[in-house]
Amino acid sequence: MFFHVKARLKLKPRTAILCDNNEELIQTFKAVQKDVDGVIQALQIHKEKHGPEYFREMRTRIFESATERAARLIYLNKTCFNGLYRVNSRGIFNVPMGRYHKPAILDEDGLREASRQLRGVRIMKRDFHKLPALAKRGDFIYLDPPYHPVSSTSYFTSYTRDPFGAKEQSDLSEVYGQLCKAGCLVMLSNSDNPFIEKLYRKLSRRFKDVKIHRVSARRNINSRAERRGHINELVIVNYDTPRR
């Protein structure tokens, strides 16, 4: 969403903030922002050495420099199964290698463009509970939580070692309400799930501007190939959107 807004819509906000609770992701954004040349050089090495044994080594390897940690994360994302990011209870990346003939490990043009779009952006590790303290009236805020499982067999929210279950989803809906009260423009996306819909139907009774939309989105991550493809998602906004 961030890169779409900045690059495709060509918007230039006076202040832009990227927040996530995933330390690895935040450090990767910062490294691409501040040292894209170093990230590219490190990825070139990963590209040359890539193979099953090297991939397994990189899954557990811990680098000291932020640049090397960022390149490792990008390498693993580009070469793991379906580009899935998942960690265990110790915070260790545990996705197996994907079956790609020539994975696109190094996209130099894409990284340089990302670095350009990140100029002047504040990047910080923050739990979503702290968002209201950063927000002010008129701000646009996009919330992209771990999607709530749509079935008992699709339970996956392990983007960090901390759980993100029903309680966290409920807490997030309360934060959404606080942002509404503060006069922010808020968009949230999540799975098309009765539990999530119920949370925001309830919120819409408190804040009349809150609206729930169903949209079709393409998803490529599923253990069963026939279940990959277009699925419905919920997009919840508290402002008017153009009719299509």
Where are these regions (language model features)?
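Short, solvent-exposed loop/turn segments at secondary-structure junctions
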Residues: 1, 23-25, 79-81, 129-131, ...
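Long, positively charged, glycine-interspersed low-complexity recognition regions
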Residues: 162, 166-244
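Conserved S-adenosyl-L-methionine
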Residues: 1-48
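A short acidic (Asp/Glu
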Residues: 3-9, 28, 134-135, 152-155, ...
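Short His-Asn-centered micro-motif
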Residues: 19-20, 124-126, 143, 188-191
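SAM-dependent nucleic-acid methyltransferase catalytic core
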Residues: 33-142, 146-157, 171, 177, ...
